[in-house]
From Swiss-Prot:
It is an enzyme of class 2 (transferase). The gene is fliB. This is Lysine-N-methylase. Its EC number is 2.1.1.-. One of its GO terms (molecular function) is methyltransferase activity. GO terms for biological process: methylation. It comes from Salmonella choleraesuis (strain SC-B67). Belongs to the FliB family.
């Protein structure tokens, strides 16, 4: 028998689907794939409604056993035909949870499997997941348990060096207090130092531990926050990000989350173009000031909401250990996503005159629903971010100023 370590953040442990109460349920507006077993089960079901819907609404593709068919939706934003009048799944109610396809039974859950470890996570494309991360100060607290199984998983080993690097990065962000930007600045410095080593061995880790300790002290004493404030801002980097991002999202076909995200993008564009004679760069500065004032007045949630979002990104992506991705480039993507989400939030605050965390939840989940619902969608989105980066990874510092 073999021991397997299972690690997961608190938001995973405590997650439960909100069902019919969900603000934007996952049974609509995107591709629902069905495996071969599920297709055959529905087509042969003794339940007349299940069988009839299968005959009328399952498109047989037979690409492979995992992608044998797809649900045909009535429109780009239409509901799955198995969703009943109470916004609950007819299959689950009639046949039980075991009758669900892999797609329907697994979302929003994700499992990153290694030889003797499993890291559990959840997708931010689910609004309930996003709400937990933004509203629970302990959402990213990690816990471990050991399970026993007959054999090791058929997956590569999770190297101890990679695990330690990931923990260093998580810890730097976790000590951000209310300055997530300063913590990201510390992370940039840490990654730049790590890239000096051709190989991360025990000797390199010894040096990196000293660098981590020094950066942590500079974070806690406010040195890095002051250093970041002293960097002359370049708002053109942010306006370029806005234009590229809105261009990308508006070019996508309609799917789940598109109406919500477009509402906030339109809000941002209105705010940035409202006054003639005022540059977009100045308007960016104005709306950021509005958000900063509202965050300053928020005595609690400001200290963890955006910090938790970055912690999630580092955990979910096993940063900085993504295969075949330069760590600075991977960090640029994290910073660019964070900056755009903050700008959408700032525009909403500027128009409303107040900060509503429900707006932030809407922005974050719809952003991820549109950009990272699956690996192929995420790759296309990250390729688009490359046009903003213009070959200069360190321009991300200007997204933090």
């Amino acid at each position: 028998m073999k021991e397997i370590t299972v690690t997961e953040p608190a938001f995973v442990t405590h997650f439960s689907c909100s069902g019919s109460a969900c603000r934007d349920h996952c049974c609509k507006g995107w591709k629902i794939t069905l495996d071969k077993t599920t297709v055959k089960k529905y087509l042969a079901s003794k339940d007349t409604a299940i069988r009839t819907i299968a005959q009328d609404h399952i498109i047989l593709l037979k690409k492979n056993n995992s992608h044998w068919g797809e649900i045909k939706l009535p429109s780009a934003l239409g509901n799955c035909p198995y969703l009943d009048e109470d916004r609950l799944c007819r299959v689950q109610k009639t046949l039980g949870a075991k009758a669900l396809s892999h797609t329907c039974s697994s979302f929003p859950r994700a499992h990153h499997t290694y030889k003797n470890e499993v890291r559990n996570s959840l997708s931010l494309a689910c609004p309930e997941v996003t709400s937990r991360i933004l509203n629970d100060p302990d959402a990213m607290a990690l816990s471990e348990k050991t399970i026993i199984q007959q054999t090791f998983n058929t997956a590569p080993l999770f190297p101890a060096q990679q695990k330690l690097l990931n923990l260093f990065c998580l810890s730097l962000i976790n000590h951000a207090n209310s300055s997530t930007e300063a913590a990201l600045y510390a992370l940039i410095k840490f990654v730049m130092y790590a890239q000096k080593f051709a190989k991360i061995d025990d000797a390199a880790l010894g040096e990196l531990e000293q660098v981590y300790a020094a950066l942590l002290e500079q974070l806690q004493t406010g040195v890095l926050a002051q250093e970041l404030m002293n960097i002359a801002p370049d708002s053109k980097v942010k306006t370029s990000l806005v234009l590229q991002m809105q261009d990308y999202f508006r070019s996508l076909p309609l799917n789940r989350g598109s109406v919500i995200l477009d509402h906030y993008i339109q809000c941002l564009l209105r705010v940035l173009t409202a006054e003639e004679g005022v540059s977009m760069e100045q308007k960016v500065s104005d709306i950021e000031s509005s958000l900063a004032r509202c965050l300053q007045a928020d005595e609690q949630q400001k200290n963890w909401a955006f910090r938790n979002l970055i912690l999630y990104k580092i955990w979910e992506n096993n940063f900085p250990n993504q295969p075949n991705v330069d760590p600075l480039r991977a960090l640029y993507i994290i910073v660019a996503e964070y900056a755009f989400i903050k700008l959408l939030t700032a525009a909403s605050v500027h128009e409303r005159g107040r900060l509503e965390w429900d707006d932030v939840t809407n922005i974050v989940y719809s952003f991820h629903s549109r950009s990272q619902h699956n690996s192929e969608v995420a790759k296309n989105f990250h390729r688009h971010i490359e046009t903003v980066r213009t070959g200069d990874d360190l321009s991300m510092i200007h997204l933090l100023t």
